[in-house]
Amino acid sequence: MLILTRRVGETLMIGDEVTVTVLGVKGNQVRIGVNAPKDVSVHREEIYMRIQAEKGNVTPGNY
């Protein structure tokens, strides 16, 4: 796992087309913005896991 430190307003790149920007920090919550092409799905982990479970692709702890 790559661990990075970013300040509010700073961005990191994933490949050539995906950017992740720190929008704000409030207490223990971080707001981030993700800019990705329309053909790249972006989900919170819990939503992704629900989608995979509905497809029958994932069992708990197996992703």
Swiss-Prot record:
InterPro entries: CsrA, CsrA_sf. It comes from the Bacteria. This is Translational regulator CsrA. It is found in: Cytoplasm. Belongs to the CsrA/RsmA family. One of its GO terms (molecular function) is mRNA 5'-UTR binding. It comes from Vibrio vulnificus (strain YJ016). Keywords: Activator, Cytoplasm, Repressor, RNA-binding, Translation regulation. NCBIfam families: csrA (TIGR00202), PRK01712.1 (NF002469). Coiled coil: none annotated. GO terms for cellular component: cytosol. The keyword Cell membrane does not apply. A key translational regulator that binds mRNA to regulate translation initiation and/or mRNA stability. Mediates global changes in gene expression, shifting from rapid growth to stress survival by linking envelope stress, the stringent response and the catabolite repression systems. Usually binds in the 5'-UTR; binding at or near the Shine-Dalgarno sequence prevents ribosome-binding, repressing translation, binding elsewhere in the 5'-UTR can activate translation and/or stabilize the mRNA. Its function is antagonized by small RNA(s). GO terms for biological process: mRNA catabolic process; negative regulation of translational initiation; positive regulation of translational initiation; regulation of carbohydrate metabolic process. The gene is csrA. Gene3D superfamilies: Translational regulator CsrA. Homodimer; the beta-strands of each monomer intercalate to form a hydrophobic core, while the alpha-helices form wings that extend away from the core.
